[in-house]
Curated annotation (Swiss-Prot):
InterPro entries xref list: G-protein_gamma-like_dom, GGL_sf, Gprotein-gamma
Role played: Guanine nucleotide-binding proteins (G proteins) are involved as a modulator or transducer in various transmembrane signaling systems. The beta and gamma chains are required for the GTPase activity, for replacement of GDP by GTP, and for G protein-effector interaction.
Organism: Drosophila melanogaster
Sites of S-geranylgeranyl cysteine lipidation: 67
Keywords, in A-Z order: Cell membrane, Lipoprotein, Membrane, Methylation, Prenylation, Transducer
Cysteines paired by S-S bonds: none
Entry keyword Membrane: yes
Entry protein name: Guanine nucleotide-binding protein subunit gamma-1
Tissues showing expression: Predominantly expressed in the central nervous system.
Localization (cell): Cell membrane
Family matches, as SMART domains: G_gamma, GGL
GO molecular function, one term: G-protein beta-subunit binding
Length: 70
């Protein structure tokens, strides 16, 4: 009997998870792509991969200078 109640409890958890997933608001791919394209064009001036860095000092990926003490 204990195995049966355990299985029933597991099934209830699964059903609740499926209900939560079914309640999620879905969007079509065309809507999502349009929103993404709009966001990208609005923020392209802030994208360092497109515009580059204004100077090497603000570039966090520049090679670090090393100090060697003899």
């Amino acid at each position: 009997m204990d195995v049966m109640s355990s299985s029933l409890q597991q099934q209830r958890v699964v059903v609740e998870q499926l209900r939560r997933e079914a309640a999620i608001d879905r969007q079509t791919i065309s809507e999502s792509c349009a929103k993404m394209m709009k966001y990208i064009t609005e923020h392209e001036q802030e994208d360092y991969l497109l515009t580059g860095f204004t100077s090497q000092k603000v570039n966090p990926f520049r090679e670090k200078s090393s100090c060697t003490v003899l």
